[in-house]
């Protein structure tokens, strides 16, 4: 009976010893924070009843930047240490002499990329069972980098401006505090600040808003600042602008007027260049002293050319006065009826008294008339380069006929005194 009772007791003792000798990794503090560039210690310890002859320790990391690619940090196996990922070479090691139940490691010169979740895996054969994994988080803190201060918006009086402040680096994310560097260190009453975004909005800026502003970026391990000088611009006098605008407007108007005048002048000049048909009338000239001629040649025809078709006698009669037809004609054939009057008169003959308009004319020597007729056709129409039409007169021929005064009296001609003209056509 005693043996039966002792058997269950012995089995209970063996089971208790087995539980006591199982491997167990102690709990970690959870998270470790360290500033960038400093040394971080990641704790890990375990308990075991077996000898440490077959101890196997592996440290792994799950980077915060890439959780899908775990990396090996350091390995202890068979009494030797092996390096893990290349970026940890020369920076990682065990804090104690191995083998040992304290398998904590250190990481020198921590970098921002070292942030992540680290796992400690421990195996010590033949010891089995229990929890053999320890988890520790590492956060590498980065102080705020030097922030950049900027002004957004117009600095004119009465405008709204925004002061910006931001740091490229900072873990944890820094907060921003704006202040004006004056006696009160307070922002203007119209300013609204956002410490998370790092902005300050100042509405309706005035001369009191001018000054030096400071932005302080801070987090758990450091601070950094930047300065910004805000100068409100007062409006410039508008008189200068008004004068400049008036001068510019006047200059433009003058240029436009000159252009219009020039255009009108050239248009008028081009119009006046068009040649018009010249009206050349038939003329009757009375000579003071006609040459003496025989009775056979008292009335003769003389063909001559007139240089400028101008009058050369002192008394001039229009040819249509002697024409039976009162309507003027350019054709000089109307004077052919005088060809039948071929009578000769002596140069010394006495002319009887002639009365005109009730006046008694003084007797004098015989006078003759020279009838000058211009024969010409209509002018020729020629096109010009600018689209207008010019008229070019045909060459004209001048014929002169001599008529005695007696003949003129017989047909009832009445002399009329007309002012003499020069060759250029002006009155003398």
Curated annotation (Swiss-Prot):
Ranges annotated as spanning the membrane: 241-261
Its biological purpose is as follows: Functions as a cell adhesion molecule through homophilic interaction. Stimulates cell growth.
Its lineage reads:
Eukaryota, Metazoa, Chordata, Craniata, Vertebrata
* Any single biological process term in GO: homophilic cell adhesion via plasma membrane adhesion molecules
Sequence ranges on the Cytoplasmic membrane side: 262-428
Q: Which Pfam families match?
A: Ig_3 (PF13927), V-set (PF07686)
Name of the protein this chain belongs to: Immunoglobulin superfamily member 11
On tissue specificity, the annotation reads: Highly expressed in testis and detected in kidney and adrenal gland. In brain, expressed in commissure fibers of the corpus callosum and pyramidal cell layers of the dentate gyrus and hippocampus where it is probably expressed by both neurons and glial cells.
Q: Which InterPro entries would you find in this protein's record?
A: Ig-like_dom, Ig-like_dom_sf, Ig-like_fold, Ig_sub, Ig_sub2, Ig_V-set, IGSF11
Ranges for the Ig-like C2-type domain?
144-234
Membrane-protein topology: Single-pass type I membrane protein
Q: Which residues are reported to carry the modification Omega-N-methylarginine?
A: 375
Q: Which PANTHER family match?
A: IMMUNOGLOBULIN SUPERFAMILY MEMBER 11 (PTHR44699:SF1)
Q: How is it modified after translation?
A: N-glycosylated.
Which residues does the annotated region (Disordered) include?
A: 376-396
Q: Where in the cell is it found?
A: Cell membrane
**Sequence ranges on the Extracellular membrane side:** 23-240
């Amino acid at each position: 009976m005693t043996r039966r009772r002792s058997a269950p007791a012995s089995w209970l003792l063996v089971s208790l010893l087995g539980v006591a000798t199982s491997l167990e990794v102690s709990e970690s503090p959870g998270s470790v924070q360290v500033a960038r560039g400093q040394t971080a210690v990641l704790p890990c310890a375990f308990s075991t009843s077996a000898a440490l002859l077959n101890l196997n320790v592996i440290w792994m990391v799950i980077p915060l930047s890439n959780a899908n690619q775990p990396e090996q940090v350091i390995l202890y196996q068979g009494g030797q240490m092996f390096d893990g990922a290349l970026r940890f070479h020369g920076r990682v090691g065990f804090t104690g002499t191995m083998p040992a139940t304290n398998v904590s490691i250190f990481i020198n010169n921590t970098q921002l990329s070292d942030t992540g979740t680290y796992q400690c895996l421990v195996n010590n054969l033949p010891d089995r069972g229990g929890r053999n994994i320890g988890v520790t988080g590492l956060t590498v803190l980065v102080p705020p980098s030097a922030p950049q201060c900027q002004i957004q918006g117009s600095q004119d009086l009465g405008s709204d401006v925004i002061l910006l402040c931001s740091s490229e680096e900072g873990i944890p994310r820094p907060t921003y505090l704006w202040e004006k560097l004056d006696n009160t260190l307070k922002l203007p009453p119209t300013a609204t600040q956002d410490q998370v975004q790092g902005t300050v909005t100042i509405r309706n800026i005035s001369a009191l808003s001018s000054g030096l502003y400071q932005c302080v970026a801070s987090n758990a391990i450091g601070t950094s600042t930047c300065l910004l000088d805000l100068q409100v611009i007062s409006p410039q006098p508008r008189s200068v602008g008004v004068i400049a605008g008036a001068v510019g407007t006047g200059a433009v108007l003058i240029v436009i007027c000159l252009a219009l005048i020039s255009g009108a002048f050239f248009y008028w000049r081009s119009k006046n260049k068009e040649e018009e048909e010249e009206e050349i009338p038939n003329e009757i000239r009375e000579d003071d002293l006609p040459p003496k001629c025989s009775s056979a040649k008292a009335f003769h025809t003389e063909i001559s050319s007139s240089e400028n078709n101008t009058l050369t006698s002192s008394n001039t009669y229009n040819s249509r006065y002697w024409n039976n037809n009162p309507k003027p004609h350019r054709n000089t054939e109307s004077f052919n009826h005088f060809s039948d009057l071929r009578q000769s008169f002596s140069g010394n003959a006495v002319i009887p008294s002639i009365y005109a308009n009730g006046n008694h004319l003084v007797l004098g020597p015989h006078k003759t008339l020279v009838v000058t007729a211009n024969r010409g056709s209509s002018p020729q129409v020629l096109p010009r380069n600018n689209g207008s039409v010019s008229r070019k007169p045909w060459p004209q021929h001048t014929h002169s006929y001599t008529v005695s005064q007696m003949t003129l009296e017989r047909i009832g001609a009445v002399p009329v005194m007309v002012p003499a003209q020069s060759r250029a056509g002006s009155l003398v």
